[in-house]
Structures are given as structure tokens and as C-alpha cells.
């Protein structure tokens, strides 16, 4: 087939408008506005396991990514589980504190996937603000526009401006899969818009001259949370090897997020045993086992990737910070856990 030359291709505005209109009622039987962001994340995660591959005969097919095969597939953590982990992790940080005291808390998932843990964290923080204002400062909060009641309901809603601020200031994530990063951003933006009217969002824009949807590029980033620039000391030729650079996706935490650490690290790190890690990323495995590796648990015979995520998470925490992971129970009883 021949590639289309973009400069010679012209598409009428009416065609684009028709495409968009076909996605919505009454031209489409699906009402995307009522789909829960968690469901969208689960749908997308079905496709994050696969990559397009060009075969030797020139045909294109989808194949499971090697790291997914070796870890028996990506695991989508159910919402009821993420909610429990978030409750246990964030409650000690938020309990008996004011919105001013928690305004600069930084919550991160360093293997965020499609963003389920970040969605639960965002929801927890939003609900914390609603309950605080209801119980301590309701009249002033209503007057300021921080909360308001839904028509015909006793339930309170946090203003879109406050939710937008929480997204920008409190929620952070990293994932090695660029598609997962985009899904996380998309899901979080949908969650922020939940229960907010178009009129409220437009009023915010007119009052502040800011975009209705915040740019989350500085919050949710693509990279390898476990491999930093120390890899270049292990393999000095890495900067001359573009394919290896693209594979490793070295991530400089200070450059990407500044010197500030996090108040909570949450997530469900991948479980990939050392034997499987060698198959899809020998370079990564050799780095973890080298003298340049910052990971103590990597020197054990029973290395599993989630060990490294525990170590990395602990190094990224502020004093008094909280780590909330789902890990196999055996970790508490083996030598690697003791380290």
C-alpha cells in the first residue's frame, strides 16, 4: 500500500463534524457521558497488553508484549481493592487536618497503568474536602463556592475549581507504557468533570482565563520508574544506542518532579520473577544485579520486580510518608523482605 502524503490531503470541516456527531446521541446509541472513568480504564487496559508488530512477510499483527507474557498478563485492580488500599494509606495523612494543611500533599503511583489507584486517591481527596467543609466550615465554604448542593438533594459537591486544583497539585503518576499514561490522564480528567456542569466549567474559564481541562503532562509521565541515569555508569555506550534508550526509558526523578518527595506512594507493582525478567529485558536485569544498582533486594537469588518497586517507593517518600502497595504475602517471610 502507499502512504498518504499529509500535505496533499485535505479533509473538509463538514466531514470532521459528521464524524464527531456520529459518536453522540441521537446518532449513536451509546451515552459516553455516563460511563464511569474506572470502566474506561478497564476497557483500555485490555489493549495495553498488546503491540503492533511488522512480521518478516510485511504483514502487521498484534502480539502480547513480552513483559506481559512473562508476568501472566497485566492485572487490573478492582475498585473495591484500590479503595481499601487508598483508605488505609491516606487516612493517617488526612485525618484531623485542614484543607490548608493538606493542600500540598503529593500522592504518586509509580507504576500507574490506566490510573485506577490515582482515580481512587483523587476520589478520596475530593470526599475528604466535602466532609471537612460540611462539618467545619459549611456556610463560608458555600459562600466561597467551594461546595454546593445538588438540586433536590442533600448531597454536596466539591466545586470544579477545587477538583481541578487537587488534580494539578496532589496527583502524580509514572508508567513505562505511553498509552497507559494517556489513559490515566484521560480518566482523571473525566473524573474531575464528574457532577460538574458545563456552565460551572465555563464560568471558571471566564473568571480565571485558564483552560477548563488542566494539562496533566507535568503530573502523569512516561518512563521507567526503576531505571535512572545511573544506568549510564553501568553501560557508558547507552547514549549511542537509540533502540536501547527507547527500551529502557531511563527516568530522572529530580529532573521530572524536582527535589520534592511524595507524601504517599500507592499502587499494585508488577510481579515479574528474575527468570522471566531476563527474557524480555536482559539489560535491565544486568543493571539491577550490578554494583551500580541502588537496589539491595536485587542482590538476592529470588529477585522479583515488585521488590524493586517497594525499595524505590520508600526512597521517594517524605519523612512520615505512607506506602500502600498490593504485594504477595510471602514477601513478609522471605530474606528479600527482611532486607
Show the residue positions of the predicted features.
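Non-catalytic nucleic-acid substrate-recognition regions in nucleic-acid-modifying enzymes
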Residues: 1-42
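Short, hydrophobic/amphipathic alpha-helical patches that form generic packing surfaces
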Residues: 18, 42-49, 186-193
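Residues that form generic nucleotide/phosphate-binding pockets
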Residues: 19-23, 46, 287-291
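SAM-dependent methyltransferase catalytic region
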Residues: 30, 59-339
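Conserved alpha/beta core surface patches that mediate binding of polyanionic ligands
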Residues: 33, 39-42, 50, 148-155
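Glycine-rich, acidic and aromatic/proline-enriched surface loops and short helix-turn segments
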Residues: 41, 45-53, 87, 91, ...
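Short, helix-capping/interhelical loops that line the mouth of catalytic, cofactor-
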Residues: 56
Amino acid at each position: 500500500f502507499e502512504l498518504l502524503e499529509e500535505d496533499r490531503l485535505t479533509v473538509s470541516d463538514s466531514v470532521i463534524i459528521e464524524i464527531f456527531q456520529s459518536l453522540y446521541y441521537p446518532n449513536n446509541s451509546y451515552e459516553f457521558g455516563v460511563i464511569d472513568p474506572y470502566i474506561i480504564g478497564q476497557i483500555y487496559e485490555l489493549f495495553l497488553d498488546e503491540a503492533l508488530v511488522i512480521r518478516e512477510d510485511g504483514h502487521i499483527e498484534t502480539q502480547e508484549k513480552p513483559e506481559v507474557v512473562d508476568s501472566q498478563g497485566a492485572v487490573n485492580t478492582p475498585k473495591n481493592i484500590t479503595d481499601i488500599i487508598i483508605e488505609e494509606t491516606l487516612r493517617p495523612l488526612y485525618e484531623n487536618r485542614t484543607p490548608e494543611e493538606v493542600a500540598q500533599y503529593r500522592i504518586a503511583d509509580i507504576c500507574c497503568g490506566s490510573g485506577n489507584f490515582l482515580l481512587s486517591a483523587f476520589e478520596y481527596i475530593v470526599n475528604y474536602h466535602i466532609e471537612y467543609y460540611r462539618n467545619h466550615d459549611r456556610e463560608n465554604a458555600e459562600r466561597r463556592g467551594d461546595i454546593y448542593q445538588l438540586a433536590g438533594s442533600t448531597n454536596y459537591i466539591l466545586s470544579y475549581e477545587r477538583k481541578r486544583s487537587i488534580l494539578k497539585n496532589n496527583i502524580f503518576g509514572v508508567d513505562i507504557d505511553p498509552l497507559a499514561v494517556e489513559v490515566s490522564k484521560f480518566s482523571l480528567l473525566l473524573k474531575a468533570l464528574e457532577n460538574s456542569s458545563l456552565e460551572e466549567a465555563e464560568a471558571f474559564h471566564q473568571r480565571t482565563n485558564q483552560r477548563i481541562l488542566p494539562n496533566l503532562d507535568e503530573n502523569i509521565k512516561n518512563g521507567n520508574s526503576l531505571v535512572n541515569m545511573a544506568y549510564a555508569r553501568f553501560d557508558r555506550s547507552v547514549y549511542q544506542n537509540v533502540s536501547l534508550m527507547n527500551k529502557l526509558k531511563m527516568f530522572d526523578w529530580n529532573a521530572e518532579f524536582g527535589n520534592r518527595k511524595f507524601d504517599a506512594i500507592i499502587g499494585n507493582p508488577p510481579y515479574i520473577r528474575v527468570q522471566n525478567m531476563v527474557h524480555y529485558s536482559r539489560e535491565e536485569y544486568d543493571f539491577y544485579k550490578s554494583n551500580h544498582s541502588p537496589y539491595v533486594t536485587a542482590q538476592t537469588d529470588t529477585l522479583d520486580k515488585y521488590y524493586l518497586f517497594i525499595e524505590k517507593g520508600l526512597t521517594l517518600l517524605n519523612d512520615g510518608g505512607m506506602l500502600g502497595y498490593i504485594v504477595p504475602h510471602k514477601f513478609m517471610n522471605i530474606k528479600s523482605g527482611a532486607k
